[in-house]
Amino acid sequence: MSRRHRAEKRDVIPDAKYGDVILAKFMNSLMYHGKKSAAETIIYGAFDQMQQKASVDPLRTFHEALENVMPALEVRSRRVGGATYQVPVEVRPDRRRALAIRWIIAAARARNETTMVARLSGELLDAANNRGSAVKKREDTHRMAEANRAFSHYRW
């Protein structure tokens, strides 16, 4: 059954320690099975570890990491006359942030440190310094968009 109106965007409650809405969104994405306290423990532990290991402001480093991972372009499939083209399109700001969060979490989970705290802090530090799997994912996305620039006139 279709909706009569578009669903309203819900306001995200800022996280308890830093009062940051984007960090709260990150926490919600990291969470499994509604276990928010576990996600909180992981994130705050990673922030503490970043502060001790690299002596940096963890919140600023987190935002730098997100900024470095956010893609500007992506490709979307467009079917034209029996052929499917990968058409490069600009990414909306909210989707850019969502993709960056998703990629950082996926890259952190794929790392081989012992605890998730260590993995997340390592990936955030790498992303803030333009290294790591999440940044590579963004570069691959941009490369794909650049390779398919010839089809950009199919944009919709």
UniProtKB/Swiss-Prot annotation:
Q: Which GO terms describe its cellular component?
A: small ribosomal subunit
**GO-annotated biological processes:** translation
Statement: the UniProt record of this protein carries the keyword Cytoplasm? no
Which key words tag this protein in UniProt? Ribonucleoprotein, Ribosomal protein, RNA-binding, rRNA-binding, tRNA-binding
Q: How does it assemble?
A: Part of the 30S ribosomal subunit. Contacts proteins S9 and S11.
Classification via NCBIfam families: rpsG_bact (TIGR01029)
Q: Which family does it belong to?
A: Belongs to the universal ribosomal protein uS7 family.
Task: Please give the name of this protein.
Answer: Small ribosomal subunit protein uS7
Name the encoding gene, please.
rpsG
